[in-house]
Regions:
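N-terminal and secondary-structure boundary signal
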Residues: 1-318, 322, 328-333, 337-343, ...
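Extended, alpha-helix-rich binding/interface surfaces that flank or overlap catalytic cores
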Residues: 352-353
């Protein structure tokens, strides 16, 4: 792309269908409109955030009306719309139904594409991985439109456009990738490689009703009133992260992207259209309890023990836990042991702080709890 990468910010206060459609058109206008990306006959894949089957008011999934508006714009430009993902929990059809998206699929005649077939895909030169097994179905289209939801994330601080593409990893392989990648910095490297491999042509962020606190599955809905759009998932994340009060160096995905020198990772490479960053910024946005600004750039034999003490770990609340066993099943290191009467124990000596358990818990019974050193640092205001 020649010149700065556009990121469009538009106010959208609710999910009134006509209002969402108009706001989306305004967001796409600085990008040349949907017609600049789509020619008649193009097959277009929508990749929303379909983490779990929760109703729209819970702000867990991309809202049905954002999917409707994007679909109508694509159809008006002559494209055929498909919708696909590999949910973290439950079947795609179940999540579409419980999230209210199935109604839009039926109304507009969208074609549903479950991500079922893992295939090795080469990562572009400059990645950490040579190839990654991703859903083969995601590579059968002329254009991918990434439709993330604005949410917090216990491991990655925020889940926006780049993180949403982790949904192209098929089902049960997700925990194994968490194990392979490990901490948030290495997970960020994996996410960047997936982003560069999948290469969505358009990214539209649903930030009308976002999620703050202990996201991405059990945080609190927060009215943000924002739609954002960009051809670059990375540039979109850079701008929106700043709006939420998270400096790029404190966001693992953005920090690693700057170190790699990826396009869209630096403010001077980006031009914001629509709302000014000052007008779009969100006051007092609540970040995950696991969030910390502590830098452990020390030798491993020193930083390891410090990092464990200054990290957060999952806590299973026995008053909420139903002992369904989902957390045990998704933990990549088998660190969780459930109690018969509710709740459970996490073996901190092997826990890798991926928070897959918290992400997948259908009851919201798991939350991050700070280690002893982190509690002190937070009390002192330095973490």
């Amino acid at each position: 792309m020649i010149g700065p990468i556009p990121v469009s910010l538009v106010r959208c206060l609710n999910y009134d269908p006509d209002g969402v459609r108009q706001s989306l058109r305004e967001a796409l206008d600085p990008l040349g409109g949907m017609g600049a990306l789509i020619s008649p006959g193009h097959k277009v894949l929508l990749k929303p955030n379909l983490l779990q089957g929760k109703p729209p008011e819970k702000a867990v999934t991309t809202h049905p009306e954002v999917i409707r508006a994007a679909s109508l714009e694509i159809m008006e430009a002559g494209g055929t719309v498909f919708i696909g993902d590999s949910p973290g929990s439950g079947s795609l059809s179940s999540v579409l139904s419980k999230s209210g998206i199935a109604g839009v699929v039926e109304d507009l005649g969208l074609k549903v594409v479950p991500f079922r077939t893992p295939v090795p895909v080469s990562v572009p030169v400059g990645g950490v991985y040579h190839s990654i097994e991703l859903a083969g179905e995601a590579f059968e289209f002329d254009l991918i439109v990434n439709l993330p939801k604005l949410k917090t994330h216990a491991q990655m601080v925020l889940t926006l456009a780049v993180k949403n593409l982790f949904g192209t990893v098929v089902g049960a392989a997700k925990p194994s990738w968490h194990l392979k990648a490990g901490d948030s910095d290495h997970m960020a490297e994996l996410l960047l490689d997936i982003y560069r491999t999948v290469a969505p042509g358009l990214n539209i962020l649903d930030g009308v009703l976002g999620m703050e606190g202990n996201g991405p599955g059990s945080g609190a809905p927060r009215e943000v009133g924002l739609l954002a759009a960009s051809p670059s998932a990375l540039a979109l994340d850079l701008v929106v992260s700043s709006l939420l009060g998270v400096d790029a160096k404190e966001n693992p995905v953005l920090r690693r992207s700057m170190e790699r020198g990826l396009p869209g990772s630096m403010p001077e490479q980006v031009k914001v259209f629509g709302l000014s960053p000052e007008d779009a910024s969100v006051d007092d946005f609540i970040l995950p309890a696991s969030y910390t600004r502590v830098d452990f750039s020390l030798p491993d034999f020193i930083s390891g023990p410090l990092k464990r003490s200054a990290s957060s770990y999952p806590f299973l609340d026995p008053s909420i836990c139903t002992t369904c066993g989902i957390c045990e099943g998704v933990c990549p290191v088998s660190a969780i042991s459930l109690f018969d009467d509710g709740g459970g124990d996490v073996d901190k000596s092997i826990c890798i702080n991926c928070f897959c358990c918290q992400e997948m818990c259908p009851e919201g019974a798991i939350r991050p709890v700070a280690g002893s050193l982190l509690k002190i640092l937070k009390r002192l205001g330095v973490a």
